[in-house]
Amino acid sequence: MVYAEHGFEKKWYCVMRDPANVAEYSVYVCDFSKMDDGNRGVGKYSASGCTYMKDAKAFAVGNRSELLYYATTTEVKQCNFKDGGTSTLRYTLPTELIQAGYEISMLYLFKVSGKENEGKLLYIGVYNPTTEEGKLLECPIVETSGEILKDKVKTYDGFKKITHMAYKSK
């Protein structure tokens, strides 16, 4: 298993790699919300057509639809695992960040029940290993299609390497 996260309709989305063929990826969808009746597996989908998944540094799963994002060093892609296992480029780091040496270190899809932006914000952590500086990009998304609204991305500075995020209520 490469990655697993709770997502849409309370199902778990598990990215799996074939140990005998590292280019072969699958997405397993499981329903752990009920008693084990021997049929918790909801689906198995090929993700081998999702370009550069072998180079993924981070993943995020949606809770408003069946979204699966993965990030390489400078790009965020959406794996269309239910549509033949293809990928769609959703975001490329701005040229100035790439030229400065920043790389993607983390993805986090905001999934806090009852909050206004639930399922509508993708956070991207970026890190420059030379300067040891990190930034956080807040990216509004269309929660049903996965499109990232590039013209509305906000950048927050003043971090070190961001490896994980969580929401804390007051």
Segments (PLM) and residue ranges:
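Repeated scaffold domains used in trafficking and secretory/extracellular systems
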Residues: M1-E9, A47-S65, I98-G114, G158-K170
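Structural hallmark of WD40 beta-propellers
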Residues: K10, E66-L68, G119-K120
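Structural motif
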Residues: K11, A20-D31, T73-N80, T130-P140
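Residue position within the beta-strands of beta-propeller blades
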Residues: Y13-C14, Y70, Y123-I124
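Short loop/turn segments that connect beta-strands within beta-propeller blades
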Residues: F32-D36, F81-G85, P140-T144
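Beta-propeller fold detector
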Residues: D37-K54, S87-L97, E147-G158
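C-terminal structured domain segments
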Residues: Y102-K111, E118-I148
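Blade-level signature of beta-propeller repeat domains, shared across WD40, Kelch, NHL, RCC1
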Residues: E132-K170
